[in-house]
Amino acid sequence: FHYDGERAVGKAAQKFNTMFGVSALSTVSVEEISSLINTPKMFQFYFHKDRGLNDAVMERVKAAKFDVMALTVDTITGGNRERDLRTGFTSPPKLTLSSLLSFASKPMWGINYLTKGKFELPHLQDHVSEGTDIATSIGNYFSTMLDQSMSWKDAEKLCSQWGGHFALKG
């Protein structure tokens, strides 16, 4: 993750007058994105088991005046994320011997890790441990936190609740 990831991509989208998308698993809040970026914005919504979390995220995105809600429908199972398993990727990142060696070979990574803002998942941090300092694999997150029983009725309800442009994202 680049410390300025979503901000930089959003500014590039604005510069080229194109739509910008941000995920529920982004490291920058929808409120900050909305205040920084003046271009059409899409939010990638993950359907969680915790309906309170779903409602809270929906309200934040609506209040931030995003233009499109895209419901992610292909992550209700974690999948075999071989690269993540091989590299030991977790969210938030944790220091291991392997990651320390990577940092040593790329000194700016280490400098940015130590000097830039703390890695957070602002849309989740008040609801699930995966938004805190507890490291988890992305596959584990998808398998345990997302609602594997999501149905067309759930999608229809979200679309109605959103009340604006709505898309399904595979």
What are these regions (language model features)?
Residues F1-G170:
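Active-site entrance/lid segments in N-terminal catalytic domains of soluble metabolic enzymes
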